[in-house]
């Protein structure tokens, strides 16, 4: 028995305790007997010197073990105290407790609000997270030119030049000024011939327009609101027409040709839905569930807890202050949890993002966790929308272990590849960057995708995205759940069938043409011949009417940039948002507008879809958009989530069709429509100010161009240096591939522009064609002849015709002489 005793001594001294189930007895013995009992045991088996060493080591271990055990014992004691505090009702309760199957009481409700009260975000809009700002700073490679800095620098130069003028010139200028004042006093009043001419041009028309517009304002106050000035003639009755025809001096009102065409188009569109198309829809869509009025009233009182969602999801919803689901969320969440395909549509600002994010998170909570795999792909048409959706999804998943990744253009490819190596659960991307990683990143596989979401699906189904969408759909698995959402969702079966939907459920909460009921729509009419005063109207509205939290939409990036410079010169704080800016600049513009550093956001249709910024009070359309659908998305940036807002459109005669469609849909819905009257003299004054700034605007543009060229030259230098230093590494990288050639890209871009603006816009642009040598020589000869360097040289035909003319002329002269 001696050998076992020798082995037990080192076991007690050198064995290190680990966390396991067998250590509970050891811990309890240590806590009950204390350090003295342990010292006695060690004294029997070790020397005095060893005793000191072991005592020091065991004391440090015992402290940690005691803390762990105390926490466990504390929890157990709490449970015992709670059990002891309950009233004893005899042995029957003990028998019932032993037979408990673990099910929750049906009346039990989670106190989600109190649990997440510390992290509640009031009015969360998907922006302002630190991740977005850090990502923009880290991944923004391009340093843009600061327009405000150029403007301030030029203004400082002008002030310095004025100060450098000698005092003599100042005295002379004062004398000249006094002389001019004397001359002006002789006339009695100053005469501005330019203003006089403008008033003379509009003299008769101005009075008529004013009466029409004042009549409209009276009609607006009485409750009958019109689309814009001039619509009274469209709504006149037959009796008025007969009375007008009886009087020779009054012309019978005639309907505008564009209105006639739009009415005919509308009737044709309504008649297009024939029996064949209806049969297609019945065969393609799943049958819709009929809800009674009582069930609809009950649904409006529902909360998120009644969807049987998991506690982490409910805590995430409470953290962003989502309490009651919106109509689209009430309809979508139960169907999406069943794994069915969905085609959803609701007005702007109704919570469509949360409608598909919440069921996705709920399903991912029950995923297998042994091997990380990417299961969800959410595709967005614009970068800003993808960044916003990423922020919303990560905020809702705060209390879960679900991982996310955003694949957006403008951010670092290397960092995105590193994140993809970890196989995140949800991928939020734009189509172009998604395809780039799909083809060129070895760590990214799409074979495991189970859910595909297309946000703003009607835009994704247009010709501009058709090729990219087809490439994605043919690569990812066909056995998936597909969900499509948009405010203006298409019903065309031919378009939807391309997505590969399997008997989708159609969830149309509102009509496709509806706007928010809290939105007031205004229209400012530009009379024929006053289209060049459009900027004057905009400056008047932004300077005197709508002074803060305004988004101004433009059709062209060039026009938005010029107006941005004009706003800076006039002292209006503005930021721009369009496709010519780097991703860092775009995110910075949105953040500055959101935080109130700037009052105006000048944007193209890039910001028309999905952008959710809290507190936007007004949307101004510098020009009416190309279609009514785009108009709905633009004005949907305000009056979101039950808040009120206002939209103002500056409309001329070419915009008549879109304005009429908007007014017609709003009246059918019962929304507020008004006509805003702007004094032409005020608009002319602001237009003249804008005209005076043209020279300064061009100078700022020229200086900006020079700075961009310098920045580009610096970038080329650094690129060349990197090529020299790291040539072997750069040349060893595999070349990135794309599914389409450059020619196919150009054709796809043209197809998208043709669908948006019409075929005429594409045909009107002159295509750049490479000239042959023969054509170049012909152009050079014509240029030289025009300059007068080389005279015109007769050709063979010209010489022969000239000879024939001389012969015929001689014969005629001989005949005349013979007659004489």
Swiss-Prot record:
Annotated positions binding ATP: 346-353
Superkingdom: Eukaryota
Coiled-coil ranges from the UniProt annotation: 681-729
Annotated catalysed reactions: ATP + H2O = ADP + phosphate + H(+)
Keywords: ATP-binding, Coiled coil, Helicase, Hydrolase, Nucleotide-binding, Nucleus, Ribosome biogenesis, RNA-binding
Entry's localization field: Nucleus, Nucleolus
GO molecular function: ATP binding; ATP hydrolysis activity; RNA binding; RNA helicase activity
Compositional bias of kind Basic and acidic residues: 130-145, 769-786
Domain Helicase C-terminal: 537-714
Biased composition (Basic residues): 806-820
UniProt-listed PANTHER family: ATP-DEPENDENT RNA HELICASE DBPA, ATP-DEPENDENT RNA HELICASE RHLE-RELATED
Function recorded in the entry: ATP-binding RNA helicase involved in ribosome assembly.
Protein name: ATP-dependent RNA helicase drs1
């Amino acid at each position: 028995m001696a050998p076992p005793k020798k082995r037990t001594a080192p076991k007690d001294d050198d064995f290190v305790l680990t966390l396991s189930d067998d250590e509970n007895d050891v811990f309890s013995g240590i806590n009950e007997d204390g350090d003295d009992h342990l010292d006695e045991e060690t004294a029997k088996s070790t020397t005095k010197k060893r005793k000191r060493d072991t005592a020091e080591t065991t004391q440090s271990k015992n402290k940690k073990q005691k803390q762990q055990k105390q926490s466990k014992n504390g929890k157990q004691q709490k449970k015992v105290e709670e059990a002891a505090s309950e009233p004893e009702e005899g042995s029957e309760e003990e028998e019932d407790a032993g037979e408990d199957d673990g099910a929750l009481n049906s009346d039990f409700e989670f106190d989600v609000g109190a649990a997440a009260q510390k992290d509640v975000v009031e009015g969360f809009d998907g922006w302002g997270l630190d991740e977005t700002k850090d990502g923009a700073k880290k991944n923004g490679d391009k340093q843009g030119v600061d327009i405000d800095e150029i403007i301030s620098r030029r203004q400082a130069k002008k002030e310095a030049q004025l100060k450098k003028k000698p005092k003599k010139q100042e005295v002379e200028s004062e004398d000249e000024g006094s002389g001019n004042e004397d001359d002006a006093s002789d006339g009695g009043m100053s005469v501005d011939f330019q203003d006089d001419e403008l008033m003379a041009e509009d003299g008769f028309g101005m009075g008529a327009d004013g009466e029409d517009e004042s009549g409209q304002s009276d009609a607006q106050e009485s409750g009958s609101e019109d689309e814009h000035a001039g619509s009274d003639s469209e709504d006149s009755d037959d009796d008025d027409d007969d009375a007008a025809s009886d009087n020779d001096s009054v012309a019978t009102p005639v309907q505008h040709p564009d209105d006639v065409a739009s009415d005919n188009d509308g009737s044709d569109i309504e008649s297009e839905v024939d029996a064949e198309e209806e049969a297609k829809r019945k065969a393609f869509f799943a049958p819709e569930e009929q809800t009674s009025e009582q069930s609809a009233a009950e649904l409006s009182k529902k909360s998120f807890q009644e969807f049987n969602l998991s506690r982490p999801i409910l805590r995430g919803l409470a953290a962003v202050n989502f309490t009651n689901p919106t109509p689209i969320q009430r309809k979508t969440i139960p169907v999406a949890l069943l794994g069915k395909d969905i085609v959803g549509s609701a007005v702007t600002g109704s919570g469509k993002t949360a409608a598909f994010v919440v069921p996705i998170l709920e399903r991912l909570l029950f995923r297998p966790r042994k091997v990380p795999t990417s299961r969800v792909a959410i595709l967005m048409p614009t970068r800003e929308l993808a960044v916003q959706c990423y922020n919303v999804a990560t905020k809702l998943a705060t209390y879960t272990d679900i991982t996310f990744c955003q694949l957006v253009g403008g951010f670092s490819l290397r960092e995105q590849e590193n994140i993809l190596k970890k196989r995140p659960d949800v991928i939020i991307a734009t189509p172009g960057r998604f395809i780039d990683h799909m083809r060129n990143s070895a760590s990214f596989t799409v074979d495991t995708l189970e859910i595909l979401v297309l946000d703003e699906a009607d835009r994704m189904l247009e010709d501009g995205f058709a090729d990219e969408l087809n490439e994605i759909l043919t690569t990812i698995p066909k056995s998936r759940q597909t969900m499509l959402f948009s405010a203006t969702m298409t019903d065309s079966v031919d378009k939807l069938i391309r997505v590969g939907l399997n008997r989708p459920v159609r969830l149309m909460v509102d009509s496709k043409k509806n706007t928010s009921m809290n939105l007031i729509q205004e229209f400012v009419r530009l009379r024929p011949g006053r289209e060049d005063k459009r900027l004057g109207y905009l400056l008047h509205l932004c300077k005197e009417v709508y002074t803060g939290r305004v988004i101004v939409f433009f059709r062209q990036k060039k026009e938005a940039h010029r107006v941005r410079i004009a706003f800076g010169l006039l002292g209006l704080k503005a930021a721009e948002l369009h496709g010519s800016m780097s991703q860092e600049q775009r995110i910075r513009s949105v953040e500055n507008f959101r935080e109130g550093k700037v009052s105006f956001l000048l944007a193209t249709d890039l910001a028309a879809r999905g952008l959710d910024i809290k507190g936007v009070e007004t949307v101004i359309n510098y020009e009416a958009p190309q279609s009514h659908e785009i108009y709905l998305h633009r004005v949907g940036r305000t009056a979101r989530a039950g808040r009120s807002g206002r939209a103002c459109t500056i409309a001329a005669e070419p915009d008549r069709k879109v304005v009429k469609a908007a007014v017609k849909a709003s009246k059918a819905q019962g929304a507020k429509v008004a006509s805003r009257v702007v004094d032409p003299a005020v608009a002319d004054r602001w237009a003249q100010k804008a005209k005076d700034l043209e020279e300064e605007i061009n100078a700022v543009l020229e200086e900006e161009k020079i700075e961009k060229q310098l920045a580009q030259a610096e970038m080329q230098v650094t690129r060349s240096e990197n090529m020299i230093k790291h040539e072997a590494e750069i040349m060893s990288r595999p070349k990135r591939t794309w599914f389409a050639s450059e020619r196919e890209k150009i054709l796809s871009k043209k197809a998208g522009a043709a669908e948006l603006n019409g075929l005429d816009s594409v045909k009107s642009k002159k295509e750049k064609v490479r000239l042959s040598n023969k054509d170049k020589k012909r152009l050079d000869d014509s240029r030289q002849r025009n300059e007068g360097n080389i005279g015109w040289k007769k050709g063979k035909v010209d010489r022969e015709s000239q000879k024939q003319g001389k012969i015929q002329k001689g014969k005629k002269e001989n005949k005349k002489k013979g007659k004489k």
